[in-house]
Amino acid sequence: MSSKLKQVTDLDLRLLRSFAEIVDRGGFAAAQAALNISQSVLSEHLKTLEIRLGYVLCKRGPGGFKMLPEGERVYKAAKQLFLAVDEFKADIGEIGDEMSGEVVIAIEDEIITNPACRLPEALQMFGERVGRRVRLRVESMVGYQAISHVADGSAHLGISVSDVRARDVATQHLFDEVAELYCGQGHPLFDVPDHEISEAQLAAHPYSSRGHLESRDVSLFTREFRAGDVGLGAQAQLALILSGRNLGYVPVHATTPLVARGRIRSVRPDITRRVVPIQVISRDTGPHGKLIALLRSCVVMAHSTASMHAGGAPAPASTG
């Protein structure tokens, strides 16, 4: 089906960005909050875009939001267009050595509450260099989403526990995160002392998969546990653990209040404790080259300084 759209105007770019936001957020409600516009205006944007293109992009209504094949193609083309526009703006800005625009940072949920995380200090350092000419947009998500957002250009920088390798993506270790296996009040193992819990008993109880993190752990706890529910992210894991339905892994720093209140407990930390690396992720190429290089250096510097103050050495660099 051919499109009626022969030239792309500023209006078309705005409409396409609204459409892409709806797709990225999985529906109108989340996109409305992200764009800070009413749902009626967002709906009008989509309707206008469909009229200008000459075909329907998606189904919406009581049944929810569902993409059509035409919508899938327009979405992919729009993402490529946005990336090209961003690269053009960055190149033009760098001709005059100007640092301006918007930088998107994707962070894994609960990363900020880790005492070892120095992202706020890094952002402060970055802000002292560029002032308010650069707008920061920070989005919280699951690890595999963070790296995929960086890989496809939706985000310029990521901070995540994910160690998945992607083309044209560079990673550098910042600090380690400790995770332990937990169960909630009401779980059969909750009141059983650790010394009475065997590996066989652990394996007999449903385990909540962490999705993207399972590939990094080939121990008993991914090979032999009974398949349970799936919790993508620390908060999702906590919801399932608190329900008493599953055993599950959560970063230790995210559980402190719940442990103190007796809602959850760590199970056999002597054999279940896991250490996972937190990394800064960026593309080798892409828009805002100087800006991203500066931001990345601020992130690495903030964590290296913290590491040295703690008596450790700066983390080594690695690329993927």
Regions found by a protein language model. Give the residues of each.
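C-terminal regulatory
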Residues: 171-245, 250-274, 301-320
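Short beta-strand-centered segments that line the small-molecule binding cleft or hinge
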Residues: 125, 143-179
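N-terminal winged-helix
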Residues: 98-129
